[in-house]
Regions:
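Hydrophobic side chains in beta-strands
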Residues: 49, 65, 160-162, 179-181
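A long amphipathic alpha-helix within ATP-dependent nucleotide-binding catalytic cores
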Residues: 81-170, 216-234
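Generic detector of well-ordered alpha-helical segments enriched in charged/polar residues
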Residues: 23, 27, 80, 140, ...
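C-terminal active-site "lid" helix and adjoining low-complexity regulatory extension at the edge
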Residues: 163-235
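A generic structural signal for short coil/turn motifs at secondary-structure boundaries
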Residues: 10-12, 129-130, 188
Length: 235
């Protein structure tokens, strides 16, 4: 997997299959990028975590399951037909054709599920399901153990790949593919079952947490961003 070193919303994230594709990505990139192992676990969650600088233990404030964009075959239609049937997948047609150009005219067998975009980003067609109620003490302890080892990390979302939800809840058999900092969102709010009012409430709650962390860091001697630095960070 190739991705921008500093990215947003899954933009620029591509699965590379050979050296030619990597060279093409390099030639068309005007930014620093990372080459990352492709994790073959089937599932992904986003785990939102925070810890106040003067406290030893942090907290998980939300967990979201990411359902990758996919289609199911009926034994009659081509992959392209199936993609175009669903507005969510049709919106991603250009990206799908780039990655699966040799498969678009294949008839997909009945009930076979094809993952179109193997990235858990809302802007890449993934559906977000709030599973915050699945957070266990064992999982919270393991995430806390990991995050406290990252110097200066007090707030953000960990994107995690896993195979089995029960093992994940036990704090086992998962891999972290990204750690997102203060620009990250509590993406469990994007579950279609939640209202806009729930989303506003979650955003407000997390901004208050981030502001409190900022004040505590300032008290410890870390300077606030000036106006120029603040606007630059927003770009």
């Amino acid at each position: 997997i190739v991705k921008p070193n500093i990215g947003l919303k899954g933009l620029g994230v591509v699965e590379i299959k050979n050296a030619d594709e990597l060279e093409n990505y390099y030639k068309n990139s005007d930014y620093d990028f990372l080459i990352q192992e492709k994790i073959n676990f089937k599932n992904e969650v986003g785990i939102f975590y925070h810890r106040f600088p003067d406290e030893k233990k942090g907290k998980i404030t939300g967990m979201v399951k990411k359902e990758f964009l996919s289609v199911k075959g009926d034994g009659k239609k081509t992959l392209k037909d199936l993609v175009m049937e669903n507005p969510r997948s049709a919106y991603q047609i250009k990206a799908v054709e780039q990655q699966m150009r040799n498969e678009m005219q294949k008839i997909i067998p009945e009930n076979e599920v094809i993952i179109l975009v193997p990235f858990g980003s809302h802007t890449r067609g993934a559906k977000f399901i709030d599973i915050s109620t699945e957070v266990t003490e064992k999982l919270a302890q393991k995430i806390d153990e990991i995050c406290t080892k990252v110097n200066g990390f007090y707030y953000g979302r960990l994107d995690v790949m896993y195979e089995n939800i029960e093992l994940l809840k036990n704090g086992e058999n998962f891999k972290i593919i990204e750690i997102n900092g203060s620009k990250s969102e509590p993406t469990h709010m994007y579950d279609p079952k939640h209202s806009i009012f729930f989303a506003w409430k979650e955003i407000t709650k997390h901004w208050k947490i981030m502001a409190k962390i900022s004040r505590k860091n300032h008290q410890a001697g870390f300077p606030y961003l000036n106006i120029k630095e603040g606007f630059s960070a927003l770009k």
